[in-house]
Amino acid sequence: MDFYAKDIACEELGQHWSMPDSQGTVRGPADLQGQVTYLFFGFTSCPDVCPTTMIELSQVKHLMGKDADQLQVVFVSVDPARDTPEVARTYVEAFDPKAIALVGNEVQLAAMASDFKAFYEKEPGPIPQTYTMSHIAGGYVFDRQGRLRLFAPYGMPVDKLFSDVQRLLLEPAHPAAGSDPLASCSLSHNGALAAR
């Protein structure tokens, strides 16, 4: 059975990044091991995509019941000028007390977005202080070994995302030789994701 989300396991994405979290601890791919992780790019002033995504992830965790802690939500701010670590932490914790907010500087953000081939762009408003951000809509889903497996598009039904998370949780934490779902991947394969 295929996943409902786009299978991107064979694409070389999200392997070489580092970004401080809202507590100042630098995080990287190795920190995504042990749980299924849903990582997405957004900003706290986002009027629609980001709060909707956080609400849907809360619904997935509710469906998971006692296993809810096996899904780690990671929010990467694309608006470091306004999203201070404290602002970002307060934002994500309003939806999920265990969510992690990553907030770096412009250079760190550009490098991380490049590693994920994630689009973001500042859109000027009528006056310099008012602007919004366009950004990729959807999330990157990692398995318990910290390997990027899926891209879940924005608007993916909660029950289907829940199903994909459950499938990843049912995989062995350390696959036996010959049973690794990524064994058939070619390291030379690479591709880009569509922007919102």
Question: Predicted regions span which residues?
Answer:
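Short active-site neighborhood of thiol/selenol oxidoreductases, capturing the structured segment around
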Residues: 29-57
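C-terminal lobe and adjacent flexible extensions of AdoMet/dcAdoMet transferase-like proteins
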Residues: 145-147, 152-196
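Thiol/disulfide oxidoreductase modules built on the thioredoxin-like
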Residues: 108-164
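Sec/Tat-exported extracytoplasmic proteins
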Residues: 36, 43, 61-68, 95, ...
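Sequence contexts marking disulfide-bonded cysteines in secreted/extracellular proteins
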Residues: 9-11, 47, 51, 184-186
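N-terminal "domain-start" segment that seeds a small globular fold
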Residues: 1-30, 55
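Hydrophobic beta-strand anchors of alpha/beta hydrolase catalytic cores
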Residues: 38-39, 73, 139
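Structural microenvironment flanking redox-active thiols in thiol-disulfide oxidoreductases
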Residues: 52-112, 196
